[in-house]
From Swiss-Prot:
It comes from the Bacteria. InterPro entries: AAA+_ATPase, DNA_heli_DnaB-like_N_sf, DNA_helicase_DnaB, DNA_helicase_DnaB-like_C, DNA_helicase_DnaB-like_N, DNA_helicase_N/primase_C, Hint_dom_C, Hint_dom_N. The gene is dnaB. Residues 135-197 are required for dimerization of a 1-197 fragment. This is Replicative DNA helicase DnaB. Pfam families: DnaB, DnaB_C, Intein_splicing, LAGLIDADG_3. One of its GO terms (cellular component) is peptidoglycan-based cell wall. One of its GO terms (biological process) is intron homing. The lineage of its organism: Bacteria, Bacillati, Actinomycetota, Actinomycetes, Mycobacteriales. It comes from Mycobacterium tuberculosis (strain ATCC 25618 / H37Rv). Belongs to the helicase family. DnaB subfamily. Homohexamer. Interacts with single-stranded binding protein (SSB, Rv0054). Co-immunoprecipitates with DarG in the presence and absence of darT. Keywords: ATP-binding, Autocatalytic cleavage, DNA replication, DNA-binding, Endonuclease, Helicase, Hydrolase, Intron homing, Isomerase, Nuclease, Nucleotide-binding, Primosome, Protein splicing, Repeat. It catalyses: Couples ATP hydrolysis with the unwinding of duplex DNA at the replication fork by translocating in the 5'-3' direction. This creates two antiparallel DNA single strands (ssDNA). The leading ssDNA polymer is the template for DNA polymerase III holoenzyme which synthesizes a continuous strand; ATP + H2O = ADP + phosphate + H(+). Induction: Part of the dnaB-darT-darG operon.
Length: 874
């Protein structure tokens, strides 16, 4: 057992002087001798193939020859000058390497085929030096990037990774063909079967747990979670005792909670079976001392390492783990515990920081090819249940959403339901808030089910709604906060604007106009005429023109029996069973046969650029919206109505594309379909709508009058405001700098939430990152008005790379911590909550998540007085 030494040994020798223009390290004679030996002897091929890869040869011609020899050898065919020449000729490479005579030159060059393995070592060493030169060049580039403003910690970490890759001789590849993976996988399956199904990974020491997991496997991230005092640190040490003391494989614990001596005491207590309390109080018997001395000599050689450095950062853990991987062939890493780690950086919330740790620990597990056990703390969820059993939802920073929750895509601009992503397996780009509160595109790299949990419906003042578990985090100004901790009146972030999608596709404008009119005032039911029925002559004319441009003739009904003038497609003689072109067009967009309460905006509109989105909204508003000036209240009225909630949500989403935040109200109707209205409040957004979107037809006159009125003083509701805590921060900073002017000094002003214009003015005077982000960011601070339980449902979550959040149902939501884990073990001790529990002395390892196998509850005995858990007698 050892303690990690943080001090790297000094380097006595000075670095070599720079010498530019030199050839990279190589030995062409050794390369020729290797290939010549392989052409002469099959045994030489066997000696060489495990030491070299094609990229280890300096000359490209030698790489081609080596690859051809290995291909022939792998197929069981002879590899000599004749067959290799034929293979290279088949590939069109023979002339490139110098023709068949060069192969005979290789044979004549080799002194003896028996030394091919030695020649291969020379080639491998030169290749390693070349990679070191390449890595050094990249490190120099990273250094210059750091001097130009890149994050220094990230630069150092990338430089370390470059050197580590060279030392570990690992060549990164973008992909591996399936055929290259089949045989190694078959070998692993065969090895598991031949060992009777025993653990192939690092054995945990618990028989039943190993039977389910087959041990802890390289590349896995394992979360061990429990409430305080249940024994999660003890379980982590049990894993290490099994790895290092029982099986003599190296392990390391990075402890942010216990000191080195405390950890060693616990290990000795568990191994010598001496009460930890007796050790600490000095009440050990002679028999205890004898057992302790005997076990100390037995475990002193165990390759177990301990690091209790305070304020340990992720970069330090990576650097130390890489060094141990080289020094001691590290097989297991334990981090105790996740919530105590620090990054040294400023994050908008602790939840984001912990999620970053989780992701980096998973990447560390994959990089070093070792299992990483991250100990984590559960929230108070178990204490609120009758049986006190923990659930996956209790994991801190964990949360879930229902299958119907719609995620905003960045590639198409449309929304897609979680359930659809699960069915299709698609992993799209999504819009996400970065640390500056700006919308950025980030990949959703994983979507997964999280079981059945209690779900709450959260409704905002703007009418937006989302269904989530109590543990799902929402963004407050103070940071990411679980839904269970939110209350009515809290302010959370929603997008105030959304950029154009990454892959925009323009639509024919005639089709766009026709589509907007059909959604707003059209009827396209099966076995009924397809009609458009406005009362505005200008709108009728617009549809007539757009239909003509789309090669769709339209005729007008204007007879007395008709309730209103209408346009319908001209009758055409079609074969039986064929629908009209306009019906086929609407069916292709998913709108044919849709009733008014079922309508929605097709994906093609969301893909369109912003100028076409504005055109679509202009004609849609003319068909189903209203724009007017209210002289009684001295303010404008801009709204759109529909019996389809989905259509209202889609229109709200499109308005964000042109930088307009809207509000949704609900009007229940007995005996019919409820209706919804989408309102645009505030002079600023109304002016933006009138200038950038506008309306068509008779409403255009009212729009011009409204725009004229809005240029003067009008009532302007303070809807787009910042949380009060921001206002307090602004006031404190201004007071400290003695910069309060008359506009920012009135006492009554501090009683209310500030409009965004005031922090914007303050931001110009004080240097405060939070105020800057608030004034310039893309977050709208909406108000929680209702939180209601809607029962248990199947729920899902996703992983967003980098920013760890996404837009769902028009609200910014965080993703979960558990998504990075391959295995989640929840620890439960019934007697931790009730000392008289009949199961006293027992503990449950609840395998709540197992990416590569079944879940199960494993019952063990807890002997915490001896700092250990133990298998139950079978």
């Amino acid at each position: 057992m050892a303690v990690v030494d943080d001090l790297a040994p000094g380097m006595d020798s000075s670095p070599p002087s720079e010498d530019y223009g030199r050839q990279p390290p190589q030995d062409l004679a050794a390369e020729q001798s290797v290939l010549g030996g392989m052409l002469l002897s099959k045994d030489a091929i066997a000696d060489v193939l495990e030491r070299l890869r094609p990229g280890d040869f300096y000359r490209p011609a030698h790489q081609n020859v080596y690859d051809a020899i290995l291909d022939l050898y792998g197929r069981g065919e002879p590899a000599d000058a004749v067959t290799v020449a034929a293979e290279l000729d088949r590939r069109g490479l023979l002339r490139r390497i110098g023709g068949a005579p060069y192969l005979h030159t290789l044979i004549s060059t080799v002194p003896t085929a028996a030394n091919a393995g030695y020649y291969a070592s020379i080639v491998a060493e030169k290749a390693l030096l070349r990679r070191l030169v390449e890595a050094g060049t990249r490190v120099v580039q990273y250094g210059y990037a750091g001097a130009e403003g890149a994050d220094v910690a990230e630069v150092v970490d990338r430089a370390q990774a470059e050197i580590y890759d060279v030392a570990d001789r690992r060549l990164s590849e973008d992909f591996v063909a399936l055929e290259d993976l089949l045989q190694p996988t078959m070998d692993e399956i065969d090895a598991i079967a031949s060992s009777g199904g025993l653990a192939r990974g690092v054995a945990t020491g618990f028989t039943e747990l190993d039977e389910v997991t087959n041990g802890l496997h390289p590349g896995q991230m394992v979360i061990v979670a429990a409430r305080p005092g249940v024994g999660k640190s003890t379980l982590g040490l049990d894993f290490m005792r099994s790895c290092s003391i029982r099986h003599r494989m190296a392990s390391v614990i990075f402890s942010l909670e216990m000191s080195k001596s405390e950890i060693v005491m616990r290990l000795l207590s568990a191994e010598a079976k001496i009460k930890l309390s007796d050790m600490r109080s000095g009440r050990m018997s002679d028999d205890d001392w004898t057992r302790l001395a005997r076990r100390m000599s037995e475990i002193s050689e165990a390759p177990l390492f301990i690091d209790d450095s305070p304020n340990l950062t992720m970069m330090e853990i990576r650097a130390k783990a890489r060094r141990l991987r080289q020094k001691a062939n590290l097989k297991l890493i334990v981090v105790d515990y996740l919530q105590l780690m620090t990054s040294g950086k400023k994050y908008e919330s602790r939840q984001v920081e912990v999620s970053e740790f989780s992701r980096h620990l998973k990447l560390l597990a994959k990089e070093l090819e070792v299992p990483v056990v991250a100990i984590s703390q559960l929230n108070r969820g178990p204490e609120q249940r009758t049986d006190k059993k923990p659930m996956l939802a209790d994991l801190r920073e964990s949360g879930c959403l229902t299958a119907s929750t719609r995620i905003l895509r960045a590639d198409t601009g449309a929304e897609v339901a979680f359930g659809e992503l699960m069915r299709s397996g698609e992993r799209p780009m999504v819009w996400s808030l970065d640390e500056r509160l700006r919308m950025v595109a980030r990949p959703m790299i994983n979507v997964f089910p999280s079981g059945r949990k209690e779900v709450f419906r959260l409704r905002l003042a703007s009418g937006r709604e989302v269904e989530a578990t109590g543990s799902h985090p929402f963004m407050k100004f103070e940071g990411w906060t679980p839904l269970a901790q939110l209350k009515v009146g809290d302010r959370i972030a929603a997008p105030r604007r959304v950029p154009e999608p990454i892959d925009t596709q323009r639509m024919p404008e005639s089709e766009l106009i026709s589509l907007a009119r059909m959604i707003g005032d059209g009827s396209c039911l099966k076995n009924q005429p397809i009609r458009y029925e406005p009362v505005d002559e200008a709108n009728l004319a617009a549809v007539t023109v757009s239909a003509a441009h789309s090669d769709r003739a339209a005729i007008r009904d204007d007879y007395l029996a008709a309730r209103v003038p209408s346009l319908r497609p001209a009758r055409q003689r079609l074969p039986r069973g064929r629908c009209t072109p306009i019906a086929a067009w609407l069916a292709g967009l998913g709108l044919f046969t849709k009733r008014s309460h079922e309508k929605c905006v097709p994906e093609a509109v969301f893909r369109a650029p912003n100028d076409q989105v504005a055109l679509f909204l202009r004609h849609l508003w003319s068909a189903g919206g209203s724009v007017r000036w209210d002289p009684t209240n001295g303010q404008g009225r801009v709204y759109y109505g529909s019996t389809s909630r989905r259509l209202i949500d889609d229109v709200a989403q499109l308005l964000l594309r042109v930088g307009i935040f809207s509000w949704i109200t609900h009007a229940p109707k007995l005996g019919g379909h409820d209706s919804w209205r989408l309102h645009i409040h505030g002079a600023k957004d109304q002016v933006r709508f009138l200038r950038h979107v506008g309306v068509h037809g008779a409403e255009a006159v009212a729009a011009q009058e409204m725009l004229r009125q809005l240029k003067g003083p009008v009532r302007n509701p303070n809807l787009d405001s910042a949380p009060k805590k921001v206002w307090a921060q602004v006031r404190n900073r201004l007071s400290a700098k003695q910069m309060m002017d008359i506009q920012l000094h009135e006492p009554t002003m501090w009683k209310h939430s500030p409009s965004r214009s005031r922090p914007h003015r303050a931001e110009a005077r004080i240097e405060d990152r939070a105020i800057h982000e608030l004034a310039r960011g893309d977050a709208y601070w909406d108000t929680v008005v209702e939180i209601t339980s809607i029962g248990d449902q199947h729920v899902f979550d996703g992983t967003v790379s980098g920013t760890h959040n996404f837009v769902a149902n028009g609200i910014s939501l965080h993703n979960s911590l558990e998504q990075d884990a391959d295995v989640v073990i929840l620890l439960h001790r019934p007697d931790a909550f009730d000392r008289d529990d009949p199961r006293g002395g027992e503990a449950d390892f609840i395998l709540a998540k197992h990416r590569n196998g079944p879940t199960k509850t494993v019952t063990v005995a807890h002997q915490l007085h001896l700092s250990r858990f133990a298998n139950m007698a079978r």
